[in-house]
Curated annotation (Swiss-Prot):
Protein name: Large ribosomal subunit protein uL11
Signal found in the keyword field: no
Annotated organism of origin: Polynucleobacter necessarius subsp. necessarius (strain STIR1)
Signal sequence residues: none
Transmembrane segments: none
Domain of life: Bacteria
Modification after translation, per record: One or more lysine residues are methylated.
One Gene Ontology term of the molecular function aspect: structural constituent of ribosome
One GO term (biological process): translation
């Protein structure tokens, strides 16, 4: 018989920097999970990634105090900002443009994000990424 699930915990943790301090410690502690075990497992799986890159993670907590976790791809906005080489998006996205990315860069981001997107095909995924970029005040060349 399958283990009884007592909850899901969604967090964004910097790659390689999970530690028992908030927000990780309290979120796992409330469910009675072993915080250090999660931190060690997460840091081991993210050591090959760029340090500090926020990684969304979904932790499934079971009734016997065990857990599993699934790591998602980094947020789209982080990838777009990195491609455009900017620190933050525009405070007024439709009037002030702060940078631009090419269609090739949008395709590269879409390829990386494809497992987490609901897009039916690659073209739809690229349009999704382009829309996110436009809402940040970044123009997409080739659209």
């Amino acid at each position: 018989m399958a283990k009884k699930i007592i909850g899901f915990i969604k967090l964004q943790i910097p790659a390689g920097k999970a530690n028992p301090s908030p927000p990780v410690g309290p979120a796992l502690g409330q469910r009675g999970l072993n915080i250090m075990e999660f931190c060690k497992a997460f840091n081991a799986q993210t050591q090959s990634m760029e340090p500090g890159l926020p990684i969304p993670v979904v932790i499934t907590a079971f009734a016997d105090k065990s857990f599993t976790f699934i790591m998602k791809t980094p947020p789209t906005t982080i990838m777009i900002k990195k491609a455009a080489k900017i620190e933050k998006g525009s405070p007024r996205p439709h009037t002030d443009k702060v940078g631009s990315i090419t269609r090739a860069q949008a395709e590269e981001i879409a390829k990386a994000k494809m497992p987490d997107l609901t897009a039916a095909d690659m073209d739809a995924a690229v349009r999704t990424i382009a829309g996110s970029a436009r809402s940040m005040g970044i123009t997409v060349e080739g659209f």
